Amino acid sequence: MDKVMAQLESLVAHYEELQEMMADPEVINDTKRYMEISKEEADLREVVQKYKKYKENKKEIEDNKEIISNETDSDLIEMAKEENAELEKEIPELEDQIKILMLPKDPNDDKDIIMEIRGAAGGDEASLFAGDLLRMYEKYAERQNWNVSMIDSEPTEVGGYKRVAIMITGDKVYSKLKYENGAHRVQRIPVTESQGRVHTSTATVAVMPEYEQVDIDIDPKDIRVDVYRSSGAGGQHINKTSSAVRMTHLPTGIVVAMQDQRSQQQNREKAMQILKSRVYDYYESQNQAQYDAKRKNAVGTGDRSERIRTYNYPQNRVTDHRIGLTLNKLDRVMNGELDEIIDALILYNQTKQLEELADNA
C-alpha cells in the first residue's frame, strides 16, 4: 500500500493542477483543450476523494488516540474509542476501494462498440436466440441511456437472425459489454417442438471497440468491395439502387457489410471505418492472446468458442460459467437487467488484477 500512497500524493497534486487549469480563461476559451482537461479531472475525481477521506480518517484516529491517552474525562475517552472503532473499520474498505481505482485502466473502456451476434449451433432456434440476445442488449442499452444503431443484418424467415451487427454508443460502453464476448447457450422448448423436449442451441457474441481514428494503413489492393441492394427483414427491398456495400479484407478474411446509411458513398465510408476498427482489433487481439497465454491468473480470453453463459428457460435460470454465478431471474435478464451479472464480472476481473499485483509486489 505504501507504493500506492506515494503515487496518490502526486496524483492529488496533478488533480489540483487540472482544477486550476479549468479556471484559466485561456483554457476555457479553447473548447477542445477544456474538454480534454475536464475529462481527465473527472476520471481522477473519485480516487482523489477516496484518498482524501482515507487521510482524514487516519488523522482523526491519531487525534482520538491523543484524547484517549491524555484526557481525564471518561465520557470523552469513551466517545473517542467508539469513534475510532468506526473509523478503523472504514480504513481497510477505503484501501481496497483505492487499490481498485488505481488499477491500470483498459484504454478501450471509454470507447463505443460494434457488436456482432450470430446464430450458431441449433438452426432456426439458434437464429431466434440471436434475436433474443439482440433485444436483451437493446433493452440494457436503453437502461444505460446508450444509443443503438443497426449496421447490418441477415434476418431469417422464422423471425430471428443468422447474423446481426449493431453499434452501441454512449458512456463507457466497452467497459461493461466487453465481457459479453463468447458463446451463449440457450436451453428451452422450441415453438416447433411437439413432444415438449428441451433443445440446446448457441449464439456467439463478438464485441469490438469502435476506434474513432484508427492508426492503421490498409492497402486498397487488400480490400474487395461488393455493392448490392439494401434489404429489410424477409428480403424486401428498401430501395432499387445498389446502395449497400460489402467490404472484405482479404489477408484476414474480415467482412463488413453496411446498408444503414442513405447512400452508397455513406455506406462505403462507414464500412471502411468499421473495417479499419475490426482489422486493428484483430491484430491487437493476437498480441493480447500472446500476452494472456503468459498470465498465470488469466480471467479468460473471451474467445468466441468458449461457452460463457447458459440461459435455461424452463427453470428461469441464467448461469455465467466464468465466475460460477447463477441467478433465478432469466426473465428479468432477458428484459435487459444485466447489471448484476456485469458488476460481478467487473469485480472478478478487478480481484484477479489485485492478486496479480500482489504476486508481483
Swiss-Prot record:
Subcellular location: Cytoplasm
Record-level GO cellular component terms: cytoplasm
UniProt-recorded Gene Ontology molecular function terms: translation release factor activity, codon specific
Keywords: Cytoplasm, Methylation, Protein biosynthesis
Family classification: Belongs to the prokaryotic/mitochondrial release factor family.
Record-linked PANTHER family: LD18447P (PTHR43804:SF7)
Protein name: Peptide chain release factor 1
Lineage of the organism: Bacteria, Bacillati, Bacillota, Bacilli, Lactobacillales
